[in-house]
């Protein structure tokens, strides 16, 4: 049997982390077993579905490198197919027209709730012989079995049973002629030959209804696996107030797709005590029986830890491609400065995100307007004039601009003055970067370049002179 899974988001908002994890699990399951992965856009909610949301879903999937073998399919383009099946069901008696007014249904609901009953349709039109005008508005309902149970073996949770008496007759076509979500899903899974439906636990209650429709159509029933929800650190369902945002916001905030994928796969799935997984390892190891039934709590610090790991473990050339986007967003012109690969090597250990790295690399490419106040107050004092003037002479004398020669110039200055490296290095750091923290001075000065370094030392010396004049 060819394994076939699907990811079927509704385009009513961005692709959030819960949806991305579901997509990842479905993708991994199919890839692990050599199957196919389908992308389907469930856009039957015409009022809430937007092109912007569709674009956000596609962008998120592409950024995460979760490729699909079929699709994207759009439910709104398949209405003729859905309605054709509904008409067949009406002819076969597995569906019927319901003419109950909104007022009657609302009164029924209120009465049931007043009696402590679960609100459900009472089957008023199910076996009715009453006649109605051809133009009288009606919905179409599925004739759900009234006896027995629906039992399915959830591949994460085990056997789940629903009594058919608890299920009312589901509306499958609205008065405006549009098919409903639960029905469209069934026909899509049937037509697309989906073998395994992996989705969030909020769909568990939809499953028995969908199984009954499939059986009424004589269609094969796929396997189902329902993934537990993601919680915030306060134990409540993850939402915007926890910082939960769309997948592309994580891109904007400087996270690598490899880090987010690694984090999401571990948010409910495990393989021993292993924390770090490449996409190849995930594909090789992923199974549904290792997915937890319990909810998982989202931990931003853990994601940052993973991101820092991948910034420093992936090939610098690969990280630099992602960094270039962030640098462009800040309007930094990198043509007059080191290659971004060098920035990744220099700043990787110091930065948890690429956004932080982009913001920290400005001094390699741009002149700064002012020195950091605290750093200048501490290190650009009159006592720093001598080491700055001395190191400038040695740096200016370098004919081959290498990291080693830069290091020797700084070390040689300290040795000649009989002071520690910090007495030379710290004023030099503030002079050439404008801030009090940076990578080692030899690699930093080398990357900034000889001419720019000398000019910045002159600027720092002028700053010291102005400071002396004001005292």
Swiss-Prot record:
Chain positions of motif 'KMSKS' region: 237-241
Domain of life assignment: Bacteria
Keyword Protease set for record: no
Gene3D superfamilies associated with the record: 1.10.10.350, HUPs (3.40.50.620)
GO MF annotation list: ATP binding; glutamate-tRNA ligase activity; tRNA binding; zinc ion binding
Main location: cytoplasm
Motif ('HIGH' region): 9-19
First-tier enzyme category under EC: ligase
Swiss-Prot/TrEMBL GO biological process terms: glutamyl-tRNA aminoacylation
Cofactor(s) for this UniProt protein: Zn(2+)
Cofactor details (free text): Binds 1 zinc ion per subunit.
Catalyzed reactions per annotation: tRNA(Glu) + L-glutamate + ATP = L-glutamyl-tRNA(Glu) + AMP + diphosphate
PROSITE patterns from the UniProt entry: AA_TRNA_LIGASE_I
Record's keyword terms, sorted: Aminoacyl-tRNA synthetase, ATP-binding, Cytoplasm, Ligase, Metal-binding, Nucleotide-binding, Protein biosynthesis, Zinc
Cellular localization per UniProt: Cytoplasm
PANTHER family cross-referenced by the UniProt entry: GLUTAMATE--TRNA LIGASE (PTHR43311), GLUTAMATE--TRNA LIGASE, MITOCHONDRIAL-RELATED (PTHR43311:SF2)
Biological function: Catalyzes the attachment of glutamate to tRNA(Glu) in a two-step reaction: glutamate is first activated by ATP to form Glu-AMP and then transferred to the acceptor end of tRNA(Glu).
Protein name: Glutamate--tRNA ligase
UniProt organism field: Yersinia pseudotuberculosis serotype O:1b (strain IP 31758)
Gene (UniProt): gltX
């Amino acid at each position: 049997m060819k394994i076939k899974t699907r990811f079927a988001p509704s385009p009513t908002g961005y692709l959030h982390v819960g949806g991305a994890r579901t997509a990842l699990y479905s993708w991994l399951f199919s890839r692990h077993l050599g199957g196919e992965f389908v992308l389907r856009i469930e856009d039957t909610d015409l009022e809430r579905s937007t092109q912007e949301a569709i674009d956000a879903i596609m962008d998120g999937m592409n950024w995460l490198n979760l490729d699909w073998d079929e699709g994207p399919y759009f439910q709104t383009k398949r209405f003729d197919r859905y309605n054709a099946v509904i008409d067949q069901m009406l002819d076969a008696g597995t569906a019927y027209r319901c003419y109950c007014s909104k007022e009657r249904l609302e009164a029924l609901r209120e009465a049931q709730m007043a009696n402590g009953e679960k609100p459900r349709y009472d089957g008023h039109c199910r076996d009715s012989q009453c006649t109605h005008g051809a133009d009288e508005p009606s919905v179409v309902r599925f004739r759900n079995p009234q006896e027995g149970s629906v039992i399915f073996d959830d591949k994460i949770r085990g056997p789940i049973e629903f009594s058919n008496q608890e299920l009312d007759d589901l509306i499958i076509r609205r008065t405006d002629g549009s098919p409903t979500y639960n029905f469209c899903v069934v026909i899509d899974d049937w037509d697309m030959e989906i073998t395994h439906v992996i989705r969030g636990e909020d769909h568990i209650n939809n499953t028995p209804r969908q199984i009954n429709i499939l059986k009424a159509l004589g269609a094969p029933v796929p396997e189902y696996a329902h993934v537990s929800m993601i919680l915030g650190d306060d134990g409540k369902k993850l939402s915007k107030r926890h910082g939960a945002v769309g997948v592309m916001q994580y891109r904007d905030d400087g996270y690598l797709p490899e880090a987010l994928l690694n984090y999401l796969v571990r948010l409910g799935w495990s393989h021993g005590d292993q924390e770090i997984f490449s996409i190849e390892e995930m594909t090789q190891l992923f199974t549904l029986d290792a997915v937890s039934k319990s909810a998982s709590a989202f931990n931003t610090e853990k994601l940052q830890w993973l991101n820092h790991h991948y910034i420093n473990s992936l090939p610098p050339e690969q990280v630099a491609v992602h960094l270039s986007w962030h640098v462009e967003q800040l309007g930094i012109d990198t043509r007059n400065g080191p290659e971004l690969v060098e920035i990744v090597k220099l700043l990787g250990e110091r930065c948890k995100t690429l956004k932080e790295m982009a913001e920290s690399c400005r001094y390699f490419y741009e002149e700064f307007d002012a020195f950091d106040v605290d750093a200048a107050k501490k290190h650009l004092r009159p006592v720093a004039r001598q080491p700055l003037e001395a190191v400038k002479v040695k740096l200016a004398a370098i004919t081959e601009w290498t990291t080693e020669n830069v290091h020797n110039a700084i070390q040689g200055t300290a040795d000649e003055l009989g002071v520690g490296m910090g007495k030379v290095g710290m004023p030099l750091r503030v002079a050439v970067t404008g801030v009090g923290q940076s990578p080692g001075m030899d690699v930093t000065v080398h990357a900034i370049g000889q001419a720019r370094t000398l000019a910045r030392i002159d600027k720092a010396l002028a700053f010291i002179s102005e400071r002396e004049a004001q005292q």
